Amino acid sequence: MKRLDLVFAITLTSLAGFVGVEAYAMRGQVGERHVVGSAGANASTIPVEDESPRPNRRVRKGSGAPPVNNDRSLVDVRTRLELSGVGTYIGEVLAAHDSALARWPDRAGQPLRIWIQPIARLRDWTPTAIPLVRDAFIEWGEAGVPLNFSFVLDSASADVRVTWIDRFSEPISGKTLWSHDDRWTILEANIVLAVHHRTGEVLDTAATRAIALHEVGHLIGLDHTTDTTSIMTPRVRVKTLSPADRATAQLLYMLPPGPVRERQGEDR
């Protein structure tokens, strides 16, 4: 192992001890991923499942600039991770993404264009679900990250498309798919949200909003955390973003996308 990777391994281990990098272990447990409605008087009683260990993603080979992987860049990123990682679950995000950071590019003030399917001919679906999804984007947009969202009527012009499904055949209630280039810059994304739990119960207002917040978190590049007070925990029991959700998203967008360690087999 090269000295650079050895130093980072020690650093990441220390960081993991604080922010809970059990994501490797979580991969084996993620079949138990359930997102439930917010705790409290208005809590949902319908479990919202999201069994996939990470958002589905695909790579567009040859897109974008080549990854930045020189020693100086990696040392800088790792130093910033070590100094700023306290109070975040960035270590778990790295573990889930094969030690890489995936995020949307800096857009110079241009918002991400969001299209939400306006009509769904599905039993029990109502238009009241649409503002719940909008609210999820707005809440993340106010989380201190350099992302703005606008809502468009034409799906062809959208960067992100949100659609509805009656229920999934697999035990999930929401799914996020995004594509990234060779540098781990996210290029486009889609979210699918279920109207019914896989057992047939209607996903109520609290459950729909919770899964929307959770999936938009995946959309911007986050993954699961063992912090049960955060919206990105596998079993969501909160109504809003936690300080750790906000801090992790902010740190993610302070750093460049791409691997934070040398890839095995790279000729350096």
Region spans (language model):
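Metalloprotease/metallohydrolase-associated module, dominated by Zn2+-dependent proteases
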Residues: 2-45, 178-207, 223-268
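Disordered inhibitory propeptide/activation segment of secreted metzincin zinc metalloprotease zymogens
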Residues: 5-125
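Soluble non-cytosolic domains of exported or imported proteins
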Residues: 68, 84, 123-135, 202-211, ...
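Short, solvent-exposed loop/turn elements at domain surfaces
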Residues: 89-91, 95, 121-126, 169-173, ...
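A short, polar/charged loop/turn motif at coil->beta-strand junctions and beta-hairpin connectors
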Residues: 106-110, 156, 185-187, 226
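Buried hydrophobic packing residues in well-ordered domains
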Residues: 114, 140, 214-217, 232, ...
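Pocket-edge structural micro-motifs
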Residues: 116-118, 164, 194-195, 234
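Metzincin-family zinc-dependent endopeptidase catalytic domain
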Residues: 127-215, 219
